[in-house]
Amino acid sequence: MATSLTWHDVLAQEKQQPYFINTLEFVGKERAAGKTIYPPQKDVFNAFRFTELHQVKVVILGQDPYHGPNQAHGLSFSVRPGVPAPPSLANIYKELASDIPGFEIPRHGFLQSWAEQGVLLLNTVLTVEAGQAHSHANLGWETFTDRVIAALNEQREGLVFLLWGSHAQKKGNIIDQRRHHILKSPHPSPLSAHRGFLGCKHFSQANQLLEQQGLSPIDWTPRLPEEA
């Protein structure tokens, strides 16, 4: 049964939990101590800002934010305008170019136009220290994103989850496959993309699954705001 819960409702419940309070407190103290934490504070929850719970059609799970300057802005795999696409995103574009007729690889890596169409771009850990991959793992973010996935599982039906790599696939264990669609492949990282991410055709498959439900497909060409 679907209800009209919003992300605000889900977040409000979690914000009262000790683990969540402790996580935010840790991140706040790290920032206050002068450490550079990505993404900036205002962007940490952007995935929920641009894709409301009732609008989600597709979920793409990432691991933790990019840890280089000016990259992370709260949407998994996406980078700010003007920043070159990192290697994993370059492979995502490569797959799109072979999977979606007419797809042209853009010169940017800004995926907000996906989010605005209903693609929840969710990292399972929402912050990271500059230059230190996975530095904020096991603080409590994973518990939070498990609750987010559980809310999607319970409140929605027919979502398409794209689970790339073992980390995302473990998260997928809580998704009811009778209610939702799960597409799995290796991670698009250069270390593993050639093992089956390239050639997975997840983007066209996701659109077919949406169209079978009478939903509009995703325009997978990432557009900058002035192009929209």
Swiss-Prot record:
Highest taxon above the source species: Bacteria
UniProt keywords, alphabetically: Cytoplasm, DNA damage, DNA repair, Hydrolase
InterPro entries: UDG_fam1, Ura-DNA_Glyclase_AS, Uracil-DNA_glycosylase-like, Uracil-DNA_glycosylase-like_sf
GO terms for biological process, alphabetical: base-excision repair, AP site formation via deaminated base removal
GO cellular component: cytoplasm
Enzyme class: hydrolase
EC number: 3.2.2.27
GO MF terms, alphabetically ordered: uracil DNA N-glycosylase activity
The UniProt record lists the keyword DNA damage: yes
Active site per UniProt: 64 (proton acceptor)
Location in the cell: Cytoplasm
Substrates-to-products reaction catalysed: Hydrolyzes single-stranded DNA or mismatched double-stranded DNA and polynucleotides, releasing free uracil
Signal peptide range: none
Record bears the keyword Transferase: no
Function field: Excises uracil residues from the DNA which can arise as a result of misincorporation of dUMP residues by DNA polymerase or due to deamination of cytosine.
NCBIfam families given in the database record: PRK05254.1-1, PRK05254.1-2, PRK05254.1-4, PRK05254.1-5, ung
Family to which the UniProt record says this protein belongs: Belongs to the uracil-DNA glycosylase (UDG) superfamily. UNG family.
Protein name, UniProt field: Uracil-DNA glycosylase
Species of origin: Pectobacterium carotovorum subsp. carotovorum (strain PC1)
Name of the encoding gene: ung
